[in-house]
A protein has these predicted regions:
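Metallo-beta-lactamase
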Residues: 4-100
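Active-site HxH/HxHxD metal-binding segment of metal-dependent hydrolases
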Residues: 1
Length: 173
């Protein structure tokens, strides 16, 4: 029954989508992350029993979908730090992460730290009422990325003021 379930919602903008929200179930310790921590991998295993088997796909998924918004990943990880113990991460793609949580979280923290530390990047800010501005901003970010430049998408409605100040202040373009 739902009596023992209490959900806490964490804003995690730009973890593939500008409106991403994590949902933590205090009753079960499950964190539902939408696309974050996901991977395009299919097997009969429901859980991450063999980390070696899924690690390459986990990294590829991060590099393609999460890495371009490494600073947003770091902000989401900070928000996760305020949660009680997480015993499972339920992702939108791939196996449930349960057996090696500290490993997967550490990978995200390390990779995002490397990508965001001292690198020059362009900040592409947008405010989308009907979904058109976010699509054009993603196209602009994709074009910037084709020039081997780093880019950070910034949803002005979903980014807290301190994070916005830091993102824009550190941006080179």
């Amino acid at each position: 029954s739902g009596i023992h379930h209490r959900f806490e919602f964490l804003s995690a903008p730009n973890l593939h989508w500008p409106d991403t929200i994590f949902s933590f179930d205090h009753g079960t310790g499950i964190l539902y992350t939408c696309d974050a921590f996901g991977l395009h991998y299919c097997s009969d295993d429901v859980f991450d029993a063999d980390p070696g088997a899924i690690a390459p796909d986990f990294r590829f998924y991060y590099d393609c979908l999460m890495g371009p918004n490494a600073r947003s990943v770091l902000q989401a990880l900070k928000r996760m730090d305020g949660l009680p113990e997480i015993n499972t991460i339920a992702v939108g793609h791939g196996p449930l992460l349960r057996h090696h949580l500290s490993h997967w979280i550490s990978d995200y923290r390390e990779w995002s730290g490397q990508r965001s530390k001292g690198e020059s990047y362009a900040a592409v800010c947008y405010l989308s009422q009907y979904g058109f501005s976010d699509r054009i901003s993603q196209a602009i970010a994709h074009g910037i990325g084709k020039a081997d430049a780093q880019v950070q998408l910034v949803d002005l409605r979903a980014t807290d003021p301190q994070e916005l100040t830091a993102l824009i202040g550190d941006a080179k373009a």
